């Protein structure tokens, strides 16, 4: 999860987030090299007295500044498209969970079970226990098995919301009348925090998401108690 004065993204917990971190570093290096080149050219222009005031045509220069940006865009687009298709791919999910956005809370339904659903509200600051996080704790966590492919169906009952968990690389819009889907897989157990990432009204900041990733045996015990 995030911590105060953090530089960079949250630690990756899913394969998709690991790919996104690699792509971020790849793109950042390209941007750094372009910025360095531009600053170098600007410094040369400011420090040298050599000018070409009579130059009317420079085919070589025009060729270079047309081909070079095209190559740079290809180097960014190819890995980006690869990750995009990976995020859209859904292969035999082990569990399906439907989440609905409301003003201003989330509701969850485990569709593989007959009667396993609940609402998830933020815990007010005055009710927090020692060690709990302000504006991030909920009364009902989403318990899911780790190391398994989970399909999330996301929609909304009222206005636009967005279901996002940064450490898993997830951000899916919740749109009224439309059912979006995404997949997640956590490689290690733990608590993973997220929030609504679409401005949805006065209490937009009070719609936290808490995923509790646990071993399969623990999840089976929990689901048996909840049904």
From Swiss-Prot:
Residues given in the record as Cu cation A1 binding sites: 161, 196, 200, 207
Ranges of the Mitochondrial intermembrane topological domain: 1-14, 88-227
Leader sequence segment: none
Phosphotyrosine: modified positions: 218
One Gene Ontology CC term in the entry: mitochondrial inner membrane
Residues that coordinate or bind Mg(2+): 198
Record-linked Gene3D superfamilies: 1.10.287.90, Cupredoxins - blue copper proteins
Cofactor binding mode and count: Binds a dinuclear copper A center per subunit.
Enzyme class: translocase
Record's protein name: Cytochrome c oxidase subunit 2
Species: Canis adustus (Side-striped jackal)
């Amino acid at each position: 999860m995030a911590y105060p004065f953090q530089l960079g993204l949250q630690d990756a917990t899913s394969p998709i987030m690991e790919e996104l971190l690699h792509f971020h570093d790849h793109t950042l290096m390209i941007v750094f090299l372009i910025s360095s080149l531009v600053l170098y050219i600007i410094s040369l222009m400011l420090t040298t007295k050599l000018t070409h005031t009579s130059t009317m045509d420079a085919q070589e220069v025009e060729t270079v500044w047309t081909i070079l940006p095209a190559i740079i865009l290809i180097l960014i687009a190819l890995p980006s498209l690869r990750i995009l298709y990976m995020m859209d791919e859904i292969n035999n999910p082990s569990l399906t969970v439907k989440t609905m956005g409301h003003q201003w809370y989330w509701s969850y339904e485990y569709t593989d079970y007959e009667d396993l659903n609940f609402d998830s509200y933020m815990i007010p600051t005055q009710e927090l226990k020692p060690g709990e996080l302000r504006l991030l704790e909920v009364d009902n966590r989403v318990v899911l098995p780790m190391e398994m492919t989970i399909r999330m169906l996301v929609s909304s009952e009222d206005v636009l919301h967005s279901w996002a968990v940064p450490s898993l690389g997830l951000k899916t819009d919740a749109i009224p009348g439309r059912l979006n889907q995404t997949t997640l897989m956590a490689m290690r157990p733990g608590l993973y925090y997220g929030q609504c990432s679409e401005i949805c009204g006065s209490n937009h900041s009070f719609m936290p998401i808490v995923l509790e990733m646990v071993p399969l045996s623990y999840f089976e015990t929990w689901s048996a108690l909840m049904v």
